[in-house]
Amino acid sequence: MGLFDFSVKELHDKLVKKEITPFDLVTESFNRIESVEDKVGSFITLNKEAAFDVAEELGDAGIDPNNMLAGLPIGIKDNIVTKNLRTTAASKILENFDPIYDATVVSKLKNAQTINIGKLNMDEFAMGSSTETSYFHKTHNPWDLSRVPGGSSGGSASAVAAGEVLFSLGSDTGGSIRQPAAFCGVVGMKPTYGRVSRFGLIAFASSLDQIGPITKNVEDNAYLLEAISGLDANDSTSINQPVERFSDNLTGDIKGLRIGVPKEYLGEGVDPGVKQAVLDALKTLEKLGATWDEVSLPHSEYGVASYYILASSEASSNLSRFDGVRYGYRSPNAHTLEELYKKTRSEGFGDEVKRRIMLGTYALSSGYYDAYYKKAQQARTLIKQDFVNVFEKYDVIIGPSSPTTAFKIDGMINDPITMYSNDILTVPINLAGVPAISVPCGFSEGLPVGLQIIGNYFEESLLYKVAHAFEQETTFHKEKPNL
């Protein structure tokens, strides 16, 4: 049994009693990385020397009994800036970018005395569902190395599933925490929009992006979200909501819980094995005293189209800052200012990023704004209202995190429409801004299936309670890939 088979609480107790040290945990992390990283490719940049230095300092000072995360190793998605540690967003254009400040979530993790093991691979600028668009390398699913780990936070999910770190941070714009968590058999939470500061998150689509935790179990996830939540003056979209003790609400009691199951989420396009795992999960929740009814989210069918217009439009604006002038890659082949812009961006961005910039610029252009961007915003309002209507009668909404299990590497990368449609069950949640968690709920042909539990605004505590109650009745979260 490895050290990372223990929970956050168990490791904290061992650290306080000095049965183990932070140095032991960092050693465990880098030993595992040395053993499996060549197979899975979770990391872009390792933080080895600094991690051991911090571990020694914490060991010498002793672990604060009230600081649950102190001394524990974490991995950070590489679109979250870390002072003096290369942050690339998995793009050539930021290949050598060395930030001069920490993201707010990184500062909070430092205050919590976690130990940053390194920066995790992702789809370039978080644009993708498979971690295949990274400039550096593809990440492989620990459960089947011929398959993708999901995306865009594929490195964050694979590192946890492979035991390279205890937990990690990802970001979720249209499913980028929940889908990889489902594909890799781990727990991933997309918080309510505004619950966690975006300051220091390299922007993709500012009205959709949200940072969240990926862990091996629900309780660990709750501890990590407690540490990174809260109002931040540096983020105008951050909301002044009290930081709850999510971990205190894991009682297992969900008697009387009312569950809505959208017919759109278990219909055409959902793999039979995925559907069966979700139906089995609903039976487990029924045994615990919950009830469920079929409901409708009628505008979900417009989710993918609306999302890719809105997200691409915001990306075309956000990514205009990468021009070769202030920081990042600068083309050596440019002789005029216009050439500098064109060549830097043409050479620095990958194909998927360029595709989305062009799509977004087109949607925002004067002749097409009303036909595309405005209509997408109107559809977003209808999608949001669907959730409001269901939450008037039901406590949570449940369905699959993804219509399929992990697909083959190179299986969809040249078919953007099929790749985009894989997000059909996750993008409506981002468009509405509500929270959702993915928890392991079974296997289909040996590959993990994720159960998506969706809540009303700022009801993460209820999501954790339901997810934890389900987890305690099953053993799926204890299953490990054979690497």
UniProtKB/Swiss-Prot annotation:
By its UniProt entry, which PANTHER family does this protein fall under?
Answer: GLUTAMYL-TRNA(GLN) AMIDOTRANSFERASE SUBUNIT A, TRANSAMIDASE
Cross-referenced Pfam families? Amidase
Instruction: Tell me the SUPFAM superfamilies matching this sequence.
Output: Amidase signature (AS) enzymes
Enzyme type, top EC level: ligase
The lineage's top-level taxon is Bacteria
Q: Which GO terms describe its biological process?
A: translation
- Write down the species: Listeria welshimeri serovar 6b (strain ATCC 35897 / DSM 20650 / CCUG 15529 / CIP 8149 / NCTC 11857 / SLCC 5334 / V8)
Q: What is this protein called?
A: Glutamyl-tRNA(Gln) amidotransferase subunit A
Mind telling me which InterPro entries this protein's record contains? Amidase (IPR000120), Amidase_CS (IPR020556), Amidase_dom (IPR023631), AS_sf (IPR036928), GatA (IPR004412)
According to the record's subunit comment, the protein's assembly and interactions are: Heterotrimer of A, B and C subunits.
Does the keyword Protein biosynthesis belong to this entry?
A: yes
Q: Which HAMAP family match?
A: GatA (MF_00120)
